[in-house]
């Protein structure tokens, strides 16, 4: 990296960190955050994400701040390790991408769910789908993942508060089609690249939530 590029990156970092630590940003975050999240912690996590993903330093400051505030409004953690939500650079804009754990969190808040299970299906698993009177899934796996083979699909299975149940299954080809529609899916720092299984789970959860008319 050339000297002037280093200086420019350092300047962006200083400006963004100053914004995140400013009284105006902290006040705004306190206005939108739920009680279980603290503005200072969110700012600290955002700064850590900037250090871990320097491409974020090239994003427009307003788009970055907007993505952080949006995550706060949703009550989602932006720590990429936790998988609730991700800050993803695309060109010079920062996008907020909700992970499957974040999608589950939003769905659970609806009050319509008792629980939701999300699993990958591998080629050597004993897996069956039944519709009609015996509507449901049957999924048995081998104890060692090395014996299960390659991933062939994913499912989300919801137990509803009204006593009902509903599931959605997507094979790997369907997941890949959804991935291809994401503008930043092939970027090296996209969660589709760094957390592919989590993003696939998020995709099937999101589709099921649409059928259930839940908030995600």
Where are these regions (language model features)?
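Structured, charged N-terminal subsegments at the starts of enzyme catalytic cores
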Residues: 2-7
């Amino acid at each position: 990296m050339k000297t002037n590029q280093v200086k420019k990156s350092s300047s962006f970092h200083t400006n963004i960190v100053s914004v995140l630590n400013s009284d105006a940003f902290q006040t705004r975050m306190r206005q939108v955050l739920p009680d279980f999240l603290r503005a200072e912690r969110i700012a600290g996590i955002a700064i850590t994400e900037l250090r871990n993903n320097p491409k974020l330093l090239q994003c427009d400051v307003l788009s970055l701040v907007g993505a952080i505030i949006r995550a706060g409004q949703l009550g989602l953690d932006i720590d990429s390790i936790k998988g609730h939500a991700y800050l993803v650079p695309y060109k010079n804009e920062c996008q907020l991408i909700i992970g499957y754990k974040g999608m589950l969190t939003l769905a659970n808040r609806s009050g319509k769910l008792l629980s939701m299970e999300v699993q990958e299906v591998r080629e050597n698993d004993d897996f069956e789908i039944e519709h009609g009177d015996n509507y449901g899934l049957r999924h048995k796996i081998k104890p060692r993942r090395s014996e299960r083979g390659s991933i062939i699909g994913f499912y989300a299975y919801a137990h509803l508060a009204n006593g009902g149940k509903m599931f959605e299954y997507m094979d790997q080809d369907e997941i890949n089609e959804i991935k291809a529609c994401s503008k930043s899916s092939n970027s090296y720092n996209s969660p589709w690249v760094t957390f592919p299984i989590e993003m696939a789970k998020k995709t099937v959860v999101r589709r099921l939530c649409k059928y259930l008319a839940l908030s995600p």
